[in-house]
Every structure is written in structure tokens, then in C-alpha cells.
Amino acid sequence: MPDRLKNKRVLVTQCGDYMGPAIAQLFAQEGALVDARPVIVPAAGGFAEYVSQNVEIDILVANLAHAPCNSPTADIQDADWEGMFDTMVHPLMRLIRHFAPLMAERGHGKIVAITSAAPLRGLPGSAAYCAARGAQNAFIRATGLEFAAANVQINAIAQNYVSNPEYYPDELVASERFQNHLKRNVPIRRIARADESAELALFLASNNSDFMVGQVVPFAGGWATNT
């Protein structure tokens, strides 16, 4: 079905990273007017300028990623912890705080956050990352319920084992060690293509998902199956 987002105004954050490229491309193919922002969402001081060009949007894709930073809990550095939250949690709050009320005033809107399945199970050695992604998921659940009556649907894709340059670059995926890891840990025994995740984002951004609110949808090939 072509043109599922015809003339819909879409903001995709951090579009050069994580799932940004695949989502921006698919949404444009479906007729959306995509504003794909390559930069990381700025801190509070620069946020007003960042959103000033998007007074009205129909769809927000909160695509927020931070470079992997794995360490035992005893070795977590304050700077690494704060970096995770400054890049992924605080921007999500500011984006939804700004755009959800505007959507509510107009009586419609979609917000899709690309988060992670990691906090659904927990990853030893990645406590900081799990904490930040878990905060994102909790925020989506709460705000999704808060804005449901205003016909604004806020949901998240909690993914893992999806091809993307930040967490699963091609050279890692191609290695024998990683392929063996997939077979042991992922029931579907493969990694997802970026376009597969983008298709789920498209569904959540379209009118077909109007009855879904506050959902954190696992997309991990069976590695995580519930929230």
C-alpha cells in the first residue's frame, strides 16, 4: 500500500545514526514530508532552537542512540552514566514534552521512540545502558496513557539484534563468533534487517495503529518476548 504517510510532516531525530537512515528513507517513500535531523538532540540550552523549525508536525520519530559503553557496574564512570542519559533519556523527555501537547491541541499525532529490548531482560556489564533505555521505556508507557484521550498515540520499538551502524555493524555481524552467538541466543537465529524495524515504525506512525498507546513493543527475534 503506497503513500501510507502521504503529506504527513515527520521529524526524525539523529537521522544519521541507529535506525534513522532506514526510517527516513521508508517514510519518504510512503509520501511523508521528512525533516531528518542529523545532529544529536541538544541539551536544554539549545533545544528551543532545535525545535523552532517544527512548530507543527504530525509524526515524531525519537531515534536516539549512544555509542556502546560496556563495563562492570563497579567500574561505571559518572561521565559515561551521565552521557547515556544526556543523549537518550533527557532528549526524549524534552521532545515529548514539547511536541505531544501541540499534537493534543490539534487532536492527532504519532510519536514513535526507537528504544531497546536490553532492559526487558537485562545485560550483565551494560547496566548504564539498560538503565537509560529502561527509563525511556517507562516514560513512553506513562506518556502514552497520558495523551491517549487526546488522540495522540505514543509507542516504542524495543529492539535488539537489528542491523545498524551503532550496535551491530556489518563487520561484527559477519564474524563467526557473532553468528554462533546468534544461534545460541536468538530463537530466530539471525539478525533483523534495518528495513524490517523501519516497517514496524511505519505501522506505529500510520493510522493502522490508532488503538495502540503506551506500548513498548519487543522486536528482537524472540530474544525478548514481553515487557
PLM region spans:
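A glycine/serine/threonine-rich, flexible loop-to-helix segment
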Residues: 149, 159-185, 226-227
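Short C-terminal tail/terminal secondary-structure segment
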Residues: 121, 202, 213-227
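Short, small/polar-rich loop/turn modules that mediate ligand/substrate recognition or access, typified
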Residues: 148, 153, 212-214
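Conserved mid-core segment of classical short-chain dehydrogenase/reductases
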Residues: 42-45, 52, 65-82, 105, ...
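Substrate-binding pocket helix/loop in short-chain dehydrogenase/reductase
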Residues: 71-73, 77-85, 111, 178, ...
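Catalytic loop of short-chain dehydrogenase/reductase
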Residues: 110-135, 140-149, 161-162
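Canonical Rossmann dinucleotide-binding motif of NAD(H)/NADP(H)-dependent dehydrogenases/reductases
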Residues: 3-35
